[in-house]
Amino acid sequence: MIIFRTKLLPMVFKRHADTFFILVFSLIPLALHFPYRVNIFLSWEGAYRLYLGQHPYRDFGLPMGFGYWLLPALFFKIFGPNMLSLVKAQVILNICGGLAFRGILKRLDVSPGVRLAAVLTFCLSYILINFWPWYNNTDIIYGIVGLYFLMVAYSERSLSRGAGALAGSALFLFLSFFTKQDGGFLMVAVGLAIVVYEAVFGREWARCGIFLGSFALVAVLFLEPLRGTAFGYWFNHGQPPHTARLSPRDILGEFLEFSQWIKFYSLLIILIVVWKARRGSFWNNQREMVFLLVTLGMLGTAAIFQVTSYTPPDNNIFFHAFAIAYILDGLASLMSWDASRYAWLLLAGVLLWWSGSYFKYLNRLFPQPVAVAMGGENVINRHTYMINTDTAHIEDEGTWTEVPGMPAFHKIKMPPST
């Protein structure tokens, strides 16, 4: 029995290691204390008003769809209106996004080794940095879940079984759009590209109709209660006093002047596609084309999203995991090597590649000396060669503490002056 268990545990871990990574990285925030962030009031405000039963666009105004606050408001109902409930809501969003990304790769028949490396990339690049709910993250998470249901729908041979997945895809893609217009629209566009491809080349016209009908039905169910409200004013489509963020010149300029990773990935993907196409049957391969559409769609989304939603500057880095999954899968196919045999090497490479995501937290355990006054000692290095005389800098977060007697701010640190 002991021998059996000894052999069983590594097998179970190997089979579900990607799920393990998703759960661990998503649950990390529950064990931490957080410094208060000024803009987090936006997450609180909308969720709290929904928690009170107020009606969006009638009792309070929003510059976006209220899909952003649905899950935080639910967690306010379950755990009470406190800041930690927002963190718990983001934990669920991260788990859903990670599992949906994993599910997309499984439905695309990506090998376990490549899938494990891609999931770890997703965890380090996108899950680890997002521990507060934020609309520029929530819309992408909803979109990834919607794309997963789309993968499920088209992998089911039975139309009746696929219909439920198509309805689920329509729901989450609409929620993505109804959370943030730009990111949500781009995620819907990726989904529509897959639906149109399957309809034209796979003759899946019935599924196309079910998806479009489901999307229209979901839209009616969400928008009908908003009739007679100020939804048209608050929904930003560039009308005064809003301004349109969709500038082709800005998008092209950002892409050509910066976007090094997006351009690098695009070059590798083009080379892989050309190589595969020369070997024949690439353009008629449904799996290859859908995988390519998803990957290019996410790269295109990231290229536009970084201009239309420019804060925070790293809100578009979800594309890394999709791109590396396609590139590693393509290299494994072209070179005929089993990525699963080199899984640990791939994981080590990803950990080194994305070491900046976690090293900045580990580095806090060993703070470096900083020169704050002239001294007689001859200690000059890259950490001490400049004297900080700025008296207007933000207060050191190391001095922040919890506010006693305020349960809503449990485990949330604030400046002592607060």
Task: Describe the function of each predicted region.
Residues 131-140:
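Short acidic/glycine- and proline-prone juxtamembrane loop motifs at membrane-interface regions
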Residues 139-158, 165-173, 194-195, 322-326:
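Specific aromatic-rich, kink-prone transmembrane helix
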Residues 62, 66, 79-99:
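Loop-to-helix entry region of an early transmembrane alpha helix in multi-pass inner-membrane enzymes
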Residues 207-250, 257, 261:
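Membrane-lumen/periplasm interface segments of specific transmembrane helices
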Residues 155, 186-216, 279-282, 331-334:
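Perimembrane helix-loop-helix junctions
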Residues 101-124:
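Transmembrane-helix signature of polytopic, membrane-embedded enzymes
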Residues 32-47, 52, 56-72, 81:
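Extracytoplasmic catalytic/substrate-binding loops of multi-pass membrane glycan-assembly enzymes
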Residues 162-181, 187-192, 217, 298-307:
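Membrane-interface alpha helices of multi-pass inner-membrane proteins
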